[in-house]
């Protein structure tokens, strides 16, 4: 016969076991709920990724990125720091603008005058390179680039060789020498960079001149207007079109000619998605790092 103390002990053990079992059941329920919550969260992740990655899987393997005037979010446009930033950030191409000084030197600068970049009204074609080289073109960036100068094309070619491809836009005006295009093509050839460069311009005659000098040198016709007969532009290997001209029909027609479509200027996810869906081959952007990361 069990003693009263033993009965009490047995009851306590039973109660303890019951409590442990109850706790374990509660824990399992909480774990199940937590696991279910985790599954729900994980199941939502692809939706978030797809919502952000509007360009589609693997789009960077199909589309090249061109840094417009270098990476001009990191340094002043069309300067060596901007070109170096584009290389360091992994852009495929740099787009830059070439023009000519009073003494015939090929320099990298977009505008006809210095007003926007320096506050000075002087025209590029009225100044020698020696005069231009004394001017800081990054004064509006504060002290960060206090010694930044207008680079020569030769300087840029030397730095970029075997590092990155160049989309060299010809800025045409009435003050350039007659051998302007010949100097440009000759310098590219002398540096052994013909396969690394593409000459582009709004001026189709400049592209014709390029092809006469070097038929193998790649060219691109820039346009902000619809091109009704792209097949007529035989001296253009590619077409550089403003973003509003990009659509599947236009891109398909140009592709049927064996030519590529380069879109400008593409600075947001919507524009990237538009170009990708249309089949554009190359995107010129002011924000290369952001476009590549998104």
PLM feature segments, named:
Residues 1-26:
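N-terminal secretory signal peptides that target proteins for export/translocation
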Residues 4, 28-294:
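Phosphate-group recognition and catalysis centered on beta-loop-alpha active-site segments
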